Amino acid sequence: MRLTKGAGLVLLARDHEIDLRLPMHPRRYDGGTPIRTLLEKGPVEVVNLIADRARFDIDLRVGKVGAEMFCKSGRHVVYAPVGAAQVEIDGHAHTLTEDHALRVRTGSGTNVTVRDGQVIVGSIHDKP
C-alpha cells in the first residue's frame, strides 16, 4: 500500500501498527490481517494492490524523474497519482494526466522510464 495524497494514516493491527504517515513510502501487510485505521491529519488517498498470493506475485514501485524500471512478464498499471507524468515504455512516449493510468501487458518484459513527474507501477505476475 502507498499513501499518495494527504498525511497521517496509520493502520492498527492487533499486535502492531503499519505506519503510512508519509506519502509514497511502501508498506506491505497481509490483507487478511484485521485492521482499524487512524487518520491523524484528515483525509488521505492510497493505492493498494491486492491479489491471491498463492497464485500471484505482486509489487508496487514508485518512479520519479529519471527512474528506469524493468517490468517482467505480467500485467502492469502505470499510474500518475499526483500531477501529470511522462513515461517512455520500450521507446514509445506516453503522457498521463493526474489520476490517469496505462495498462501494460507483456509476455517478455518491458522497460518503463519516467521522463517527467512521478508514477506508481503496480505489477501482477503469475507464480511459476
Where are these regions (language model features)?
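Jelly-roll (double-stranded beta-helix
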Residues: 1-128
